Regions:
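Structured C-terminal cap/extension of enzyme domains
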Residues: 3, 8, 15-134
Length: 134
């Protein structure tokens, strides 16, 4: 529509994030299946920033904490075997599957270092997939 230049979307490797129950939206396509939609938005000139890519992993005390393995079923073996934290895996995945940036929670310098590493090396874990789609 050329009315918007940027969208901040609630998305995870498992698909859309459900704000109501703080999990993956029931019936949501997984992020791989959302890629054509994300590519269409980017081709129209819209930047996409991912929100909540790590929230479901960490959770909150009043929600029963998180589930650090929840996205593992969406990852291939090289990503699962990479020396990355569960948060780094999630950020790397969403960055290489249609997003321009990810809004990541950072409360310590260690978080900043981990998040930078995930962003800077994300393409390394998906080189084969990228080569096959080019």
């Amino acid at each position: 529509t050329k009315q918007f230049d940027l969208a901040m979307i609630a998305i995870t490797p498992g698909g859309w994030y459900d704000w109501n129950d703080r999990s993956i939206l029931d019936g949501s396509p997984k992020m791989n299946d959302l890629r054509p939609l994300l590519d269409k938005a980017r081709a129209a000139g819209m930047g996409l920033i991912g929100m909540k890519a790590g929230r479901f992993l960490a959770g909150r005390k009043w929600l029963g904490w998180g589930n650090p393995d929840v996205f593992n079923k969406y990852y291939d073996r090289p990503l699962l075997e990479a020396k990355l934290s569960e948060f780094q895996r999630s950020y790397a995945f969403v960055l290489e599957h249609g997003l321009d940036a990810v809004n990541a929670d950072m409360q310590t310098m260690q978080h900043l270092t981990e998040n930078f590493t995930a962003a800077a090396t994300s393409a390394d874990y998906f080189a084969d997939q990228i080569a096959n789609t080019a």
